[in-house]
């Protein structure tokens, strides 16, 4: 490696941005094909390409940070700014869904029956599965904080236990959400209520799956001693993301499940 007199990481040429963009194109095109022609071939191809890209790209980043020492404090600072901006963009993303929901519910049109929920819609009871889901995610927020503090204090086993509990709670939340969707008395086709409900909660569920994936990767990295008490931004970013998912769910619960019912 050539000698450099600065702390920045000069990344080597990589094919993964190209394959990542290709997978995004395949997934969005595949989603359209699935909706309109009931064909999932392109969607499955896009998902497979996306998962392979993520695996290989993360593998490269882990190699560069953990084994080659490219993630200096200056580089980590840049990564922190990047993660903060990413979470801000996600906040704006969900703001659009809440805007659509409140735009429709605060002034229901005559087509909706002049009331909210619209005529003919039987909303879910917010004190049943949604309340359990809220408890599960709040508990996972406590356990991920426990894992983070254990890591900073050098308690490796406690960190692994807390992280495993968080992952288990995330998987449990996903299963509860899937059962709720299966038993829901309305569908995404049931007007503005169905579409705002399933798009907002569905995208949140997707973020829970993504966050759980981040945490699973961190769990296996910790098993291989990749994190230290002072060098663990990969885990820290996953924890930030998980707290974001928690907060979004609280807004979803209060707005769509409780107030909206």
UniProtKB/Swiss-Prot annotation:
Residues 35-40, 106-128, 184-190, 257-261 are mitochondrial intermembrane. Coiled coil: none annotated. It catalyses: 4 Fe(II)-[cytochrome c] + O2 + 8 H(+)(in) = 4 Fe(III)-[cytochrome c] + 2 H2O + 4 H(+)(out). It is found in: Mitochondrion inner membrane. The keyword Membrane applies. InterPro entries: Cyt_c/ubiquinol_Oxase_su3, Cyt_c_oxase_su3_dom, Cyt_c_oxidase-like_su3, Cyt_c_oxidase_su3-like_sf, Cyt_c_oxidase_su3_a-hlx. The chain crosses the membrane at residues 16-34, 41-66, 73-105, 129-152, 156-183, 191-223, 233-256. GO terms for biological process: mitochondrial electron transport, cytochrome c to oxygen; respiratory chain complex IV assembly. GO terms for molecular function: cytochrome-c oxidase activity. It is a multi-pass membrane protein. Keywords: Membrane, Mitochondrion, Mitochondrion inner membrane, Translocase, Transmembrane, Transmembrane helix. GO terms for cellular component: mitochondrial inner membrane; respiratory chain complex IV. Component of the cytochrome c oxidase, the last enzyme in the mitochondrial electron transport chain which drives oxidative phosphorylation. The respiratory chain contains 3 multisubunit complexes succinate dehydrogenase (complex II, CII), ubiquinol-cytochrome c oxidoreductase (cytochrome b-c1 complex, complex III, CIII) and cytochrome c oxidase (complex IV, CIV), that cooperate to transfer electrons derived from NADH and succinate to molecular oxygen, creating an electrochemical gradient over the inner membrane that drives transmembrane transport and the ATP synthase. Belongs to the cytochrome c oxidase subunit 3 family. This is Cytochrome c oxidase subunit 3. The gene is MT-CO3.
């Amino acid at each position: 490696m050539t000698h450099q007199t600065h702390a920045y990481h000069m990344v080597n040429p990589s094919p993964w941005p190209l394959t990542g963009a290709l997978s995004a194109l395949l997934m969005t095109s595949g989603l359209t094909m699935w909706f309109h022609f009931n064909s999932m071939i392109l969607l499955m191809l896009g998902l497979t390409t996306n998962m392979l890209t993520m695996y290989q790209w993360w593998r490269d980043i882990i190699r560069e940070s953990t084994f080659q020492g490219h993630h200096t404090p200056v580089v980590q600072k840049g990564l922190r700014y990047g993660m903060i901006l990413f979470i801000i963009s996600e906040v704006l993303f969900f703001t659009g869904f809440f805007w659509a929901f409140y735009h429709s519910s605060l002034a229901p049109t005559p087509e909706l029956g002049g009331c909210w929920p619209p005529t003919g819609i039987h909303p879910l009871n917010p004190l049943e599965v949604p309340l359990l889901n809220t408890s599960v995610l709040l508990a996972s927020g406590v356990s991920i904080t426990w894992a983070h503090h254990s890591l900073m204090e050098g308690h490796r086993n406690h960190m692994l236990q807390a992280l495993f509990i968080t992952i288990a709670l995330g998987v449990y939340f996903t299963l509860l959400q899937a059962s709720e969707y299966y038993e829901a008395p309305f569908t995404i086709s049931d007007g503005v209520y169905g579409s705002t409900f399933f798009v907002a909660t569905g995208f949140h569920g997707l973020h829970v799956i993504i966050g759980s994936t981040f945490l699973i990767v961190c769990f296996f990295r910790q098993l291989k001693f990749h994190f230290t008490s002072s060098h663990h931004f990969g885990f820290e970013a996953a924890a930030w993301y998980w707290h974001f998912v928690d907060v979004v769910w609280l807004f979803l619960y209060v707005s769509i499940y409780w107030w909206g019912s």
